[in-house]
Swiss-Prot record:
GO terms for cellular component: cytoplasm. It is found in: Cytoplasm. Its main location: cytoplasm. InterPro entries: Mur-like_cat_sf, Mur_ligase_C, Mur_ligase_C_dom_sf, Mur_ligase_cen, Mur_ligase_N, MurCDEF_pg_biosynth, UDP-N-AcMur_Ala_ligase_MurC. The gene is murC. Belongs to the MurCDEF family. Pathway: Cell wall biogenesis; peptidoglycan biosynthesis. This is UDP-N-acetylmuramate--L-alanine ligase. It comes from the Bacteria. Keywords: ATP-binding, Cell cycle, Cell division, Cell shape, Cell wall biogenesis/degradation, Cytoplasm, Ligase, Nucleotide-binding, Peptidoglycan synthesis. PANTHER family: UDP-N-ACETYLMURAMATE--L-ALANINE LIGASE, UDP-N-ACETYLMURAMATE--L-ALANINE LIGASE-RELATED. The lineage of its organism: Bacteria, Pseudomonadati, Pseudomonadota, Gammaproteobacteria, Vibrionales. It catalyses: UDP-N-acetyl-alpha-D-muramate + L-alanine + ATP = UDP-N-acetyl-alpha-D-muramoyl-L-alanine + ADP + phosphate + H(+). NCBIfam families: murC (TIGR01082). GO terms for molecular function: ATP binding; UDP-N-acetylmuramate-L-alanine ligase activity.
Length: 486
């Protein structure tokens, strides 16, 4: 440890006490975005970090380079030296490392519990909602960084301007994505909460009851202290319905006339969104946002609302908006390539819920109106495909050409009628487009070689391993001869 690092740690310890009797922290599923972010912050705070995952990836390699001990595969001996074990949502009690920790009476905590511990002595800003969490977290982080406040942040995806999804800052500010998928965000006790929207998703967690999901968001907001602030999107009909039940200070944002922070005159020019933000008791801001789509204008308005309440200068806000590079796999431009059939633009996007796919399609249409939209879609989870089947069909038939990959199961068993072939048949029967089903991604290059044309926008869409597929296509530069050879 360098002298500078020791001095930095001493400064942090003056603000944030260390966890007593905790020396070594073990993460099961350390390669995931949410887990790795917390692990990286704790590693930089001086704790010994170990972790395990089923396979190596860029995240595990980066953590290993920073000094973490990463095991590939799960086995009981991995937790032998741990003071505490942190588990991701995907890890159950049958995991051999969890069983070994229980037998050795080593505390086992969920990811959100450890995040709550990081937040306990800091000024926490938590970003929740069904969609837009990762981008909003990144935008808040960028504003505070531009203002010289050096925040700690833990995000669910890569903050491209920082080159990482988490970083330990020198101030008391912690900006974090809050995960509602398993209701674990109820562990958090922030000073400021953003809620971007509320839709029916992860319903198995909530017993299939949307009212339970809504009440859980209310409970999350009521974790705020009485002087805390709830920043919520009034355009969302569910949030508008819930506002009277929120017993904390509420600040609203959106395109709606009655929003406290209001977006006006939105238009899109290619990759950039341009609009005016009107704020109460402050000058209006003319924003150039370096990521496309009305949905991202909403994400930006949420970040601007938080920054305005914290009295951050307009110069920092404007610089963050124009300077943002976005987040990994959120309408990520991977390049423009000469395919042999013509020039094609390749974009990768993580959206996997019908609402997310819909706003991505609209962003593509608005920014590149002259391009044919070719989508490679990989459904994520059979349960989501079943629950939102008609919504998926309605959204996906909007593209010009649809290539459908098999469902990315994410550990689920197949559900009859909720598979990609069925979804293709349903869309085909409506008569707008004729989807192409590709059972094996190895066949994808040849399929694309036969359908891509000059000027196409090729959009890889989904939350499974399609991001890896998109990068493989980019590595081949979408060249027809290269892809056929592959």
């Amino acid at each position: 440890m360098t002298i500078q690092h020791k001095q930095d740690l001493a400064q942090i310890r003056a603000m944030v006490p260390e966890m007593r009797r905790v020396k070594s922290i073990h993460f099961i599923g350390i390669g995931g975005a949410g887990m790795s972010g917390i692990a990286e912050v704790l590693l930089n705070e001086g704790y010994q970090i170990t972790g395990s995952d089923i396979a190596e990836n860029a995240v595990t390699e980066r953590l290993a380079q920073k000094g973490a001990k990463v095991y590939i595969g799960h086995q009981a001996t991995n937790v032998a030296e741990a003071s505490v074990v942190v588990v991701s949502t995907a890890i159950n009690e049958a995991n051999p490392e969890v069983k070994a920790a229980r037998e050795a009476r080593i505390p086992v905590v969920r990811r959100a519990e450890m995040l709550a511990e990081l937040m306990r002595f800091r000024h926490g800003i938590a970003v929740a909602g069904t969609h837009g969490k990762t981008t909003t977290t990144a935008l808040v982080t960028q504003i505070y960084s531009e203002a010289g406040l050096d925040p700690t942040f833990v995000n669910g995806g890569l903050v491209k301007s920082a080159g990482t999804n988490a970083r330990l800052g020198s101030s008391r500010i912690l900006i974090a994505e809050a995960d509602e998928s398993d209701a674990s965000f109820l562990h958090l006790q922030p000073m400021v909460c953003i809620v971007t929207n509320i839709e029916a998703d992860h319903m198995d967690t909530y017993g299939g009851d949307f009212e339970t999901l809504k009440q859980t968001f209310i409970d999350f907001l009521h974790n705020l202290p009485f002087y805390g602030q709830a920043i919520v999107c009034i355009d969302d009909p569910v949030i508008r319905e819930l506002i009277p039940r929120i017993s904390r200070q509420v600040i609203t944002y959106g395109f709606s006339e009655d929003a406290d922070v209001r977006i006006e005159n939105y238009h899109q020019e290619g990759q950039q969104g341009k609009f005016t933000v009107v704020r109460k008791d402050c000058e209006a801001l003319d924003i150039t946002l370096n990521i496309p789509g009305r949905h991202n204008a909403l994400n930006a308005a949420a970040a601007i609302a938080v920054a305005t309440e914290d009295e951050i200068g307009d110069d920092a806000i404007l610089a963050a908006m124009i300077g943002t590079q976005g987040t990994g796999r959120r309408f990520e431009h991977l390049g423009e390539f000469e395919t042999g059939n013509g020039n094609v633009m390749l974009v990768d996007d993580y959206g996997h819920h019908p609402t997310e796919v819909d706003v991505t399609i609209h962003a593509a249409r608005n920014g590149w109106q002259d391009k044919r939209l070719v989508m490679i879609f990989q459904p994520h989870r059979y349960s989501r495909t079943r629950d939102l089947y008609d919504d998926f069909a309605n959204v996906l038939e909007q593209v010009d050409v649809l290539v459908m990959l098999d469902v990315y199961a994410a550990g689920e068993k197949a559900i009859a009628g909720a598979d990609s072939r069925s979804l293709c048949r349903t869309i085909r029967s409506r008569g707008k487009i004729d989807p192409i089903f590709v059972a094996d991604t190895q066949q994808l290059p040849e399929v694309l070689a036969n359908i891509l044309q000059e000027g196409d926008l090729l959009l890889a869409q989904g939350a499974g391993d399609i991001g890896k597929v998109a990068r493989q296509l980019a590595a081949l530069e979408l060249n027809i001869s290269n892809m056929k050879a592959k």
